[in-house]
Design a protein with these regions (language model features):
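Cytoplasmic/organellar membrane-interface segments at the starts of transmembrane helices
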Residues: 357-363, 409, 413-478
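Hydrophobic alpha-helical membrane-insertion segments
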Residues: 37-49, 167-175, 370, 447-461
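Hydrophobic transmembrane alpha-helices and their helix-loop junctions in integral membrane proteins
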Residues: 89-105, 113-130, 140-423
Length: 478
C-alpha cells in the first residue's frame, strides 16, 4: 500500500518550499539554485513512487488537503510524473541561462511554486481545489512572462493573465452551475449524481472556454506566441511541460474520466481543434521569430491532443495521453535549443541566422531530433502518438477531421524544416553565434533529446503506461 503522504509531498515540497528559496539565497545563490532543483526532484520522486500503485496495480491513492480530496490515479500520476521530470531539466538549464539577469529570487520562487500548483491541480478531486490551483498557476505564469519588466513584456504578461483568468472565471460559472444541479463540488459525487446523463450544453461550453484559454486553443490562443518575451526556460515550461497541458488534462479528467457530454459538445471540440491546428500551423509557416514559430507549433500540436480526446475512442485517447509526454519532451527540447541560439546570437529573427550547426553542433543535432519527433517521423515517439490520434479521429466517424489533421501534420514538417534550414544550415545571414551554450544548458537540451529518442525507440513502456491510464479512466472517480 502506497503512503498517501507521497501525494502531499509531490504538491507541498515545491509549493511551500519555493518560499524558502529567497531566504536560502541570502546565504548562497548556488545553494538556492540547487535547493530549487532538489524541491522539484523531490516532487518527481514522489510522483514516480506512486506509479507502481496507481498504474501497475490500478489502485487509487487518496488523501485530503484542507479537507478536500486528492486522488492519485493512472491519469494523474502519468501527467504529474511527465511535468515534474521536464520541469526538473528546465530548472537545471536555468542555472546558467538566468545567471546574469536580475530578479533571480523571484524567478526560482515562481517556477518552483508553479510546479507545486500544477501538482495540486493534477491531484485535485474537488472542483474548488482544482480552481484554486488553476489560478495559482496563472499568477506564477503572469510574473514569469513579464520577468524582464520591459513595458512590452508587462503588457504581454497582462494579456496572458487577463485571457487565462477571464477564461477561468467563465469556467467557474460552469462549476457553480454543476453544483446547482448536484449540490457538490466533489468529482466522484458529481459523477454519481449525474448517473451518466450528459452535462448541460451551457455548462460544457462555459467549462470549455476556461480549458481552451489555458491551453491556448483557437480562438483564445493569441497570448501564447506573445509569451515568447519570457526567458526561454519559462517559455519551455509554459509551452511544453506544464501550462498548456493543464487544459487538456482537465478536459480528460472531467469529460473522459468523469462526465458525459452531448454530440454538440463533441462536434464543437473537433471543429475548434481542427481550426486551431491549421490556423496556427499556417502562422508558423510565415513567422520569422524563432520562439513565436515554436509557440504557434505548440498551439497546433495541442489541437492534436484535443482531437484524440474528443474522438472518444480507446486508440485516440491513448494517443492523446501519450502525446502529452512525447510533445513535452520534444517541444521542451526545441524551446531550450531556441534559448541557446538566442543567448548566443542575441536575436530571435531566423532570417538573421544561418550556418550555426558549425558552431553549435550539439544544439543543432538536438533541435533536429526533437523536430523529427514533433513532425511525427518514425521511430520517434511523436510518430506513434500522432498516428494513434489520427486513427482515433478516423474511427470517430469524422473523415473531414482526419483529413484536416493530416494536412496539419504536413504543415508541421514544413515549418520545422524551414526553421532548421534558416537557423542551422547554409551560410550565416547576419548574427553568427561564436560557440555552444554552457555545459549546463547544452547538457539539459541533450537530456531532453535523449529522453525523446528513447521514449520513441522503447515505445512499449510509455505506451503501456498511457494505455493503462486510459483503461482506468472510466472508473477512476470512485
Amino acid at each position: 500500500m502506497t503512503d498517501p503522504s507521497l501525494l502531499l509531498a509531490a504538491i507541498l515540497l515545491p509549493a511551500l518550499g519555493a518560499f524558502l528559496l529567497p531566504l536560502i539565497a541570502m546565504v548562497s545563490k548556488s545553494a538556492r539554485n540547487v535547493s530549487a532543483a532538489a524541491l522539484v526532484f523531490g516532487a518527481f520522486c514522489a510522483n514516480v513512487a506512486l506509479i507502481p500503485t496507481a498504474l501497475w496495480s490500478g489502485e487509487v491513492v487518496e488523501t485530503t488537503l484542507v479537507g478536500l480530496r486528492l486522488v492519485a490515479d493512472g491519469l494523474a500520476v502519468f501527467v504529474a510524473a511527465t511535468s515534474s521530470l521536464i520541469s526538473l531539466i528546465i530548472i537545471i538549464y536555468s542555472f546558467d541561462y538566468i545567471d546574469h539577469y536580475e530578479h533571480q529570487n523571484e524567478y526560482y520562487l515562481m517556477v518552483t511554486m508553479f510546479l507545486g500548483s500544477m501538482m495540486g491541480l493534477v491531484y485535485s478531486s474537488n472542483l474548488i481545489l482544482l480552481f484554486a490551483f488553476w489560478e495559482l498557476t496563472g499568477v506564477a505564469s503572469w510574473r514569469l512572462i513579464g520577468y524582464f519588466r520591459k513595458d512590452t513584456d508587462v503588457k504581454r504578461a497582462n494579456k496572458a493573465f487577463l485571457i487565462t483568468v477571464g477564461g477561468a472565471l467563465v469556467m467557474l460559472i460552469g462549476f457553480v452551475m454543476l453544483w446547482n444541479t448536484t449540490r457538490t463540488f466533489d468529482l466522484a459525487e458529481i459523477k454519481t449524481q449525474l448517473g451518466g446523463t450528459p452535462v448541460d450544453d451551457w455548462v460544457f461550453v462555459l467549462i470549455l472556454i476556461g480549458i481552451l484559454s489555458k491551453s491556448a486553443t483557437l480562438p483564445v490562443h493569441t497570448w501564447l506566441p506573445d509569451a515568447g518575451v519570457a526567458p526561454s526556460p519559462v517559455t519551455s515550461l509554459l509551452h511544453a511541460a506544464v501550462l498548456v497541458k493543464i487544459g487538456v488534462y482537465v478536459f480528460a479528467r472531467l469529460f473522459i474520466a468523469g462526465f458525459a457530454y452531448s454530440e454538440f459538445g463533441h462536434t464543437l471540440v473537433l471543429v475548434l481543434a481542427a481550426a486551431s491546428a491549421l490556423v496556427s500551423a499556417g502562422a508558423a509557416l510565415v513567422e520569422t521569430d524563432i520562439k513565436r514559430i515554436i509557440a504557434y507549433s505548440t498551439v497546433s500540436q495541442i489541437a492534436f491532443i484535443f482531437l484524440g480526446l474528443a474522438s472518444g475512442t480507446p486508440v485516440g485517447v491513448t494517443g492523446a495521453i501519450l502525446y502529452i509526454l512525447m510533445h513535452g519532451l520534444a517541444k521542451g527540447g526545441l524551446f531550450l535549443c531556441a534559448g541557446i541560439v538566442e543567448h548566443q546570437t542575441h536575436t530571435k529573427d531566423i532570417t538573421q541566422m544561418g550556418g550555426l550547426w558549425r558552431k553549435m553542433p550539439v544544439t543543432a543535432l538536438s533541435f533536429l531530433l526533437c523536430s523529427l519527433s514533433v513532425m511525427g517521423i518514425p521511430p520517434f515517439g511523436g510518430f506513434f502518438s500522432k498516428a494513434m490520434v489520427i486513427m482515433g479521429g478516423a474511427e470517430s466517424g469524422h473523415p473531414w477531421v482526419t483529413g484536416t489533421f493530416v494536412l496539419g501534420a504536413v504543415f508541421t514538417v514544413l515549418y520545422l524544416l524551414r526553421i532548421y534550414n534558416k537557423v542551422f544550415l547554409g551560410e550565416p545571414a547576419g548574427k553568427g553565434g561564436s560557440h555552444e551554450g554552457s555545459r549546463t544548458m547544452v547538457g539539459s537540451v541533450a537530456a531532453l533529446t535523449v529522453l525523446s529518442v528513447v521514449a520513441g525507440v522503447a515505445i512499449n513502456w510509455p505506451g503501456r503506461l498511457a494505455e493503462i491510464a486510459v483503461n482506468q479512466m472510466m472508473g477512476i472517480i470512485k
